[in-house]
């Protein structure tokens, strides 16, 4: 085996293998986004004796104190069950970094530590061997965190396993609320379409509204546009919306049908108890439809014919479709836009041969007092599998300068206080 820099083509061909479980940050498109942010990029990997790539990683070189922080965002990519290969990679990476002005290196691999069911019952053993291997190479582990951290990628995820399933069989595994709300969205006639680059502001409007409502930390517009600009068809932006003209027409047709049926039944003499109950039920439905029709007509008058309900940013790579971020309108939440969007994207996975639908981030704190308990409950209702990643690892390469860097950083933080 040999450790080497890789060409873009070598890197791309390797990470296209879905069995390697690569992340959307470890794709060739991310080279352009990192360079657009002003960072140099280097692709480092391992080749076997037949010159085949068996490990790869995209590193950003972040200028710091006359040196570089080497950060592989969700790398490296390899068969991490092969501890011998991981050991070789880390050992050779250390040699490379000592020769290339590295201050310190950060790795946060897309590698599993443990898997749980939706109720946090373990399904696998803990992968302590992998964590201990990093530590044996001098890496500091950021810990088994159970909260969001702006300096780290998420460590917990909610994932749907689609392998061997159909939309119908998968839907049976959802809880009653998920099933009911998906059906509501369908009955309302909610549609989903993909936004073009020129329409991305429609996503941002919903995203900013959700940010203001929830108080969650958000990304800048430029952050999103960087991906939109460079990721091409690997970034998907669905928009769930309702066309009130179509909905009102559907309501009116349904109302007319119910009124005609009620009138026909009323015209009959000697009505049975069963018929009287049916008439009473139709009267309730007619009253409901009239209220819905009035509300929809008023909304069309004040808010327009098209109501944008929910939107999201998704990344698709060889391994999965990943829900990165989203937003929705609280004013129109009765139309169940987020449910329509997620159900549409789950079906997109089936239609395009994906075996994983990743709802992505969770804090790891599953208690009722946690900051994202509502998010967990939402994802839990889809019967997700909870995946815990191994976390962040740091290693100082230039130890003297690293000590100085940390000392200055502590001083700066004290001055801010």
From Swiss-Prot:
Its EC number is 2.3.2.18. Gene3D superfamilies: 1.20.58.90, 3.40.630.30. Keywords: Acyltransferase, Cell shape, Cell wall biogenesis/degradation, Cytoplasm, Peptidoglycan synthesis, Transferase. The keyword Membrane does not apply. The keyword Acyltransferase applies. Coiled coil: none annotated. It comes from the Bacteria. PROSITE patterns: FEMABX. GO terms for molecular function: aminoacyltransferase activity. It is an enzyme of class 2 (transferase). SUPFAM superfamilies: Acyl-CoA N-acyltransferases (Nat). One of its GO terms (cellular component) is cytoplasm. Transmembrane segments: none annotated. InterPro entries: Acyl_CoA_acyltransferase, FEMABX, PG_Glycine_Bridge_Synth. One of its GO terms (biological process) is cell wall organization. It catalyses: MurNAc-L-Ala-D-isoglutaminyl-L-Lys-(N(6)-tri-Gly)-D-Ala-D-Ala-diphospho-di-trans,octa-cis-undecaprenyl-GlcNAc + 2 glycyl-tRNA(Gly) = MurNAc-L-Ala-D-isoglutaminyl-L-Lys-(N(6)-penta-Gly)-D-Ala-D-Ala-diphospho-di-trans,octa-cis-undecaprenyl-GlcNAc + 2 tRNA(Gly) + 2 H(+). It is found in: Cytoplasm. It holds the Pfam family FemAB. PANTHER family: AMINOACYLTRANSFERASE FEMA, LIPID II:GLYCINE GLYCYLTRANSFERASE. Belongs to the FemABX family. Catalyzes the incorporation of amino acid(s) into the interchain peptide bridge of peptidoglycan, using aminoacyl-tRNA as amino acid donor. This is Aminoacyltransferase FemB. It comes from Staphylococcus epidermidis (strain ATCC 35984 / DSM 28319 / BCRC 17069 / CCUG 31568 / BM 3577 / RP62A).
């Amino acid at each position: 085996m040999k450790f080497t820099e890789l060409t873009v083509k070598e890197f791309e061909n390797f990470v296209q293998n879905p069995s390697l479980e690569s992340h959307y940050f470890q794709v060739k498109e991310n080279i352009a986004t990192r360079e657009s942010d002003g960072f140099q990029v280097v692709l480092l990997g391992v080749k076997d004796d037949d010159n085949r790539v068996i490990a790869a990683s995209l590193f950003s070189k972040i200028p710091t104190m006359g040196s570089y922080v080497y950060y592989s965002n969700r790398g490296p990519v390899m068969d991490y069950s092969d501890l011998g290969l991981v050991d070789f990679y880390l050992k050779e990476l250390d040699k490379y970094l000592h020769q290339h002005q590295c201050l310190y290196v950060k790795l946060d691999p897309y590698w599993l530590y443990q898997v749980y069911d939706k109720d946090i019952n373990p399904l696998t053993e803990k992968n302590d061997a992998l964590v201990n291997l990093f530590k044996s190479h001098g890496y500091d582990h950021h810990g088994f965190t159970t909260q969001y951290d702006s300096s780290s990628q998420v460590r917990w995820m909610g994932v749907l396993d689609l392998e061997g399933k159909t939309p119908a069989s998968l839907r049976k595994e959802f809880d009653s609320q998920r099933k009911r709300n998906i059906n509501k969205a369908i009955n309302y006639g909610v549609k989903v379409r993909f936004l073009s680059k020129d329409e991305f502001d429609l996503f941002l409007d919903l995203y900013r509204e959700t940010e203001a409502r929830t108080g969650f930390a958000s990304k800048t517009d430029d952050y999103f546009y960087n991906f939109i600009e460079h990721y091409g068809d690997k970034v998907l932006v669905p928009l769930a919306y309702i066309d009130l003209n179509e909905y009102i027409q559907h309501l009116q047709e349904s109302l007319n049908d119910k009124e005609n049926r009620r009138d026909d039944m009323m015209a009959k003499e000697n009505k049975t108890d069963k018929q009287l109950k049916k008439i009473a039920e139709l009267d309730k439905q007619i009253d409901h439809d009239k209220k819905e029709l009035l509300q929809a007509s008023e909304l069309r008058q004040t808010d327009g014919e098209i109501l944008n309900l929910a939107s999201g940013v998704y990344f698709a790579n060889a391994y999965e479709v990943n829900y990165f971020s989203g937003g929705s309108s609280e004013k129109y939440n009765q139309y169940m836009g987020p449910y329509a969007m997620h159900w549409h994207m789950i079906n997109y996975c089936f239609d395009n041969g994906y075996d994983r639908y990743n709802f992505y981030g969770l804090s790891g704190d599953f208690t009722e007092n946690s900051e994202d308990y509502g998010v967990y409950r939402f994802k839990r209702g889809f019967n997700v599998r909870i995946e815990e990643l191994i976390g962040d690892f740091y290693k100082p390469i230039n130890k003297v300068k690293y000590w100085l860097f940390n000392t200055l950083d502590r001083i700066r933080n004290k001055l801010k206080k």
